[in-house]
Amino acid sequence: MWVPPEDKDPILLMAPTRKSVALFGAVSLRDGKLVTHFEKKFNAMTFRDFLTILLRHRRRMRKIVILLDNAKYHHAVMLRPFLKNHRDRLAMEFLPAYSPELNPIERVWKLTRKLCTHNTYFEKLETLIDAVATEHKIWNVPNETLRKLCCII
């Protein structure tokens, strides 16, 4: 197909920005249910807020084991009292350094990029957040897609 030279490589103008959003997430390996939480930034306080949300989603008499990378805020001193209070319901296991391929949630982030953000221009950060949140609402219930994607053999 012939395309005029001036239309061959269209230039998409976009305003430079340093805006960002933090997204915490966890997948139940038992049933594939996804729990996510948007924040303005990653730090110990926002991580503690996410852990509180995660504890609300846990099944009775079940302990939650979370696989984590070694981000600084995962080891924060201010988390110790919270973790001590919830040690019967919450356990944290740290993955080896520089090994994101071992973290099941990384597969979910890759699928999210593929399905709703890949090769897409979002004029506003809010539009991006809405697109990701809409996709994640589908996965807020037990589902086979995420269960199979995140299964550990």
Report residues per predicted region.
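C-terminal anion-handling pockets and recognition modules
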Residues: 105-153
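Short, glycine/charged-enriched secondary-structure capping and boundary segments
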Residues: 1-3, 79-83, 107-108
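RNase H-like two-metal-ion nuclease catalytic core shared by retroviral integrases
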Residues: 20, 68-70, 77, 93-115, ...
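RNase H-like polynucleotidyl transferase catalytic core
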Residues: 5-16, 84-104, 121
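Residue-level signal for pocket-adjacent positions within structured domains
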Residues: 29, 33, 97, 144
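Extended, low-complexity cationic-aromatic segments
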Residues: 1-53, 149-151
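Short beta->alpha junction loops/turns
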Residues: 40-43, 71-72, 98, 121
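RNase H-like DDE/DDD metal-dependent nuclease/strand-transfer catalytic core used by mobile genetic elements
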Residues: 46-92
